[in-house]
Swiss-Prot record:
The protein's annotated pathway: Cofactor biosynthesis; (R)-pantothenate biosynthesis; (R)-pantoate from 3-methyl-2-oxobutanoate: step 1/2
Subunit structure: Homodecamer; pentamer of dimers.
Organism of origin: Helicobacter acinonychis (strain Sheeba)
InterPro entries hit by this protein: Pantoate_hydroxy_MeTrfase (IPR003700), Pyrv/PenolPyrv_kinase-like_dom (IPR015813), Pyrv_kinase-like_dom_sf (IPR040442)
Enzyme Commission numbers on file: 2.1.2.11
A Gene Ontology cellular-component term: cytoplasm
Protein known as: 3-methyl-2-oxobutanoate hydroxymethyltransferase
UniProt cofactor note: Binds 1 Mg(2+) ion per subunit.
Cellular localisation: Cytoplasm
Length: 270
């Protein structure tokens, strides 16, 4: 049975947690119904990431993404994808305290069909996570390289290169697990500590730039399909030269129009 026909039921957190130590979790970003529909039969998880602020709106970071933006794109993704577990990124400033976080998480649940919300931060977010999970919100954690902290960190820096960082990462992971996160994203973490975290906690880890030992992997679709050639992170594998292919198609279309080859008789009404 092909991957396209194998999955028919909505994937839940229980399904994903049952995959730990048995089967890798396949995750990808999406921001609209068109791509979500294409990804639907293949992936387990779709993240409506605040990365859309960079890939869709050409911003330098994720910080100006708004809750309204995330709601709009989550609704679109949910219209296209019916099977995957859909996670909505909580944008910068939308979970600055427990009251704000709960209000905005409830708004995501009420206005979209998202399965879960994702927030960045370590053990300092444990109490907030507990508050959300007590109200029935599924929370996905995110530690390591955290894009919402890029200005504080002075850039996008890999974590876990020394013993102090490794200790903090493990403490963060254990605290978040205890607080109730259902999944944990490990971004930009050195492979050895990502492996340790994955072994130590009972919930699945989803890696991005954190080595092959995580319970699953996620990539930004526009990176893996080759739509950005100005910068490519080390961890990205391009499976398609998307930008090149699309530009060639548009060039062919433009040439056909200029030369009067499009539309032809079969493409015209009489």
């Amino acid at each position: 049975m092909s991957m396209q026909t194998a999955k028919t039921k909505k994937i839940t957190l229980n399904h994903l947690q049952a995959k730990k130590n048995h089967e890798k979790i396949i995750a990808i970003t999406a921001y609209d119904a068109l791509f979500a529909q294409m990804f639907d039969p293949i992936v387990d998880v779709i993240l409506v990431g605040d990365s859309l602020n960079m890939s869709f709106f050409n911003q330098n970071d994720t910080l100006s993404a708004s809750l309204e933006m995330m709601l709009y794109h989550t609704k679109a993704v949910c219209m296209g994808a019916k099977t995957p577990f859909i996670i909505t990124d909580m944008p910068f400033g939308s979970y600055k305290d427990e009251k704000t976080a709960l209000k905005n998480a409830i708004k995501v649940y009420k206005e979209t069909q998202a399965s879960a919300i994702k927030l960045e931060g370590g053990k300092e977010k444990a109490k907030l996570v507990k508050t959300l999970t007590n109200e029935g919100v599924i929370v996905v954690g995110h530690i390591g390289l955290m894009p919402q902290f890029v200005r504080l960190d002075g850039g996008y820096k890999i974590k876990g290169k020394n013993e102090e960082q490794q200790k903090k990462l493990l403490e963060d992971a254990l605290s978040l697990e205890e607080a109730g996160v259902g999944l944990l994203v490990l971004e930009g973490i050195t492979t050895p500590i990502a492996q340790v975290i994955t072994q130590k906690i009972k919930i699945p880890t989803i890696g991005i730039g954190s080595g092959k030992d995580c319970d699953g992997q996620i990539l930004v679709w526009s990176d893996m399909l080759g739509f950005f050639d100005s910068f490519k992170p080390k961890f990205v594998r391009e499976y398609l030269k998307g930008k090149e292919l699309v530009q060639k198609a548009i060039e062919q279309y433009a040439d056909d129009v200029k030369k009067g080859f499009f539309p032809n008789e079969l493409e015209s009404y009489h």
